[in-house]
Amino acid sequence: MHLGNLYAALMSWLSVRRRGGRWILRIEDLDPQRSRLEYARQIEDDLRWLGLDWDEGGVDSHGPNGPYVQSLRSDFYREALSQLDDTGLTYPCYCTRAELHAPSAPHASDGRFIYPGTCRPPHLTGRAIPNRKPSTRIIVPDRQITFTDLICGPQSVNLAREIGDFILRRADGAWAYQLAVVTDDALMGVTEVMRGDDLLTSAAQQIYLYELLGYQPPEFAHIPLILNEQGIRLSKRDTSLSMEALRASHTPQSLLGLLAHRAGLIPSPTPITLDNLL
C-alpha cells in the first residue's frame, strides 16, 4: 500500500461508518505475478495500524459471502461468464497486447486505447491463430450509459466509441477486473463503491455487465487521486510514500490528520483520531 491506497480506504471507511453500513475487505489478487499472501497480510496490518476495521472479509474470509480472496472465487466468475456467453455477446479475441497498442491503433482523445473490433463477429472468420490462446471479449452497445457519481456528478459514456469491446477473461486464463468486481460486488451485496477517479470510466463498463447479469448496480463515488510532486499518480515506486516509510515517520493520528486535511475534512493537517472524524 501507499498513501493513495490508504486515502481511498479511509474515505470509504468513513462513508460506511457514517451511513451505518458494513465495510468489506476483499483481497483482489487476480494477477498471480503481483500477488502474494504476505502482501495481503501486510495490507491487513497497515489498516489495523491506522484503526480501520472491517466487518467482512480479509485473508481469512470472515463473513457470510466468502471467500473474500478473488483467487479463490473462480467458480463464481466462471458462472457469470457462462451467463454472458448465453447472451451471444461474447467472442474469442486473438489480438496480442503489442498488436493492439501499435501506433496505428485507435485511441481516444486522452490517449486511452479503443479496441477496434478486429476479432468481433463477423470479422473473426479466418482470424483464429494456431497455437495462440484467445482472450474473451464482450460486445458493447453504441449508446450512452449514464449514471450519477456521488462525487463527480452526472456521467455519460458511450462504450462503443470511447472504450470498445472489453476483455472478460485474458488469454492466460486470468479473470479480468471488470467481470470479477461486478460478480463479487453483486454477490456480496455491495451498495457503495468508493475508489480513485482514474477508474471513473470503469463504472460504465461495470454498469453494462450489471445489466446483462440482472443485478442492481451500486452507487459509485470516485475520489480525486493523490499525486506526487511531479503531478503524477502515486505508485509502489514512490518509496517515500510507501506504508513502511509512512509508519516510520508518522503516528496513526498524524497520518489521519494529513489525509483528513487532504480530503477537506479539517482545516489543517493536525493529528486527529478516527472518532473525531465521524
Language model: regions and residue ranges:
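A short, terminal or domain-edge coil/loop segment
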Residues: 48, 79-89, 119, 143-156, ...
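Active-site cores that bind ATP or allylic diphosphates and position pyrophosphate for catalysis
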Residues: 98-235, 242-246
